[in-house]
C-alpha cells in the first residue's frame, strides 16, 4: 500500500491580489487614446524563438506600438508603452488593458504607468475574452502571416512584422468594428470631422 501525495499547486504572486478589470470588455470608445489593449505572442524561428508584443487602440484597432524580442522582460514592456506614448497624445483617463503576465504586473511597469497617468486594467485569470481585440489580432496575424512560413532568425520576423502591421494591417485591413474601414481610415475620418 502506498500513499498518494496531492500535487503541489503553484500560486502566482498576483493571483490572490485584486487587480482591477476596469475595461470589463467595454471595448467601444468614441475617440482615440482612451482604451489601449496589449499582449504578446510567441513566434518560432529556426535559430531563436521570439516574442511579438503590441499595443492596439480600441477606437480604431490600430497597432500603435509593437516590439519583437527574444526575451519577455518588464523593460521590454516599458519600452513598448514608452514608444506608444511618444507617438500619441493621451489623456489622464487612458486605460491600458493587459493580461496578468509577470511582465505586466511587474514593479517596473507599474512604476512607469503611474506618473504617466495610465490606468492599468487586467483580464480575469484564464479568460482571454477580456482582451478579445488583441487576441483576435494574434489569431489573424498568425493565420495570415506567421504560420504560413518559416523564419530563420529575429531579423526575418521583424521584417515580416513591419510589412504585415505597417504595410497591411494598419493601412488596408478592414474591420467590422470600423464599418469595414482600415484602422488608418477610421482615425483619418475621426480627425477630419
Task: Give short role names for the model-derived ranges.
Residues 48, 67-89:
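Active-site beta-loop-alpha junctions of metal-dependent nucleic acid enzymes
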Residues 1-31, 127, 182-190:
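Basic, flexible linker segments flanking DNA-binding modules
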Residues 91-105:
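Cysteine/selenocysteine-centered motifs that mediate thiol-based redox chemistry or coordinate metal-sulfur cofactors
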Residues 114-118, 140-193:
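C-terminal domain-tail junction helix/linker
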Residues 23, 39, 55, 61, ...:
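Mobile genetic element proteins and their domesticated derivatives, centered on retroelements
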Residues 1-8, 96-100, 114-133, 149-152:
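RNase H-like polynucleotidyl transferase catalytic core
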Residues 29-64, 70-72:
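An active-site-proximal beta-strand-loop segment
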Amino acid at each position: 500500500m502506498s500513499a498518494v501525495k496531492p500535487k503541489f499547486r503553484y500560486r502566482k504572486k498576483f493571483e490572490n491580489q485584486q487587480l482591477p478589470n476596469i475595461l470589463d470588455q467595454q471595448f467601444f470608445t468614441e475617440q482615440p487614446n482612451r482604451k489601449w489593449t496589449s499582449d504578446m505572442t510567441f513566434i518560432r524561428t529556426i535559430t531563436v524563438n521570439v516574442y511579438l508584443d503590441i499595443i492596439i487602440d480600441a477606437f480604431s484597432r490600430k497597432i500603435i506600438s509593437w516590439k519583437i524580442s527574444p526575451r519577455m522582460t518588464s523593460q521590454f514592456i516599458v519600452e513598448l508603452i514608452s514608444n506608444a506614448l511618444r507617438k500619441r497624445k493621451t489623456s489622464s483617463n487612458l486605460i491600458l488593458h493587459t493580461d496578468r503576465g509577470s511582465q505586466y504586473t511587474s514593479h517596473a511597469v507599474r512604476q512607469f504607468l503611474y506618473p504617466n497617468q495610465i490606468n492599468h486594467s487586467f483580464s480575469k485569470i484564464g479568460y482571454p475574452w477580456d482582451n478579445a481585440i488583441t487576441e483576435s489580432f494574434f489569431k489573424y496575424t498568425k493565420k495570415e502571416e506567421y504560420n504560413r512560413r518559416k523564419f530563420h532568425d529575429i531579423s526575418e520576423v521583424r521584417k515580416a512584422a513591419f510589412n504585415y502591421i505597417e504595410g497591411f494591417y494598419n493601412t488596408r485591413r478592414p474591420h467590422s468594428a470600423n464599418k469595414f474601414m482600415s484602422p488608418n481610415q477610421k482615425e483619418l475620418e475621426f480627425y477630419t470631422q
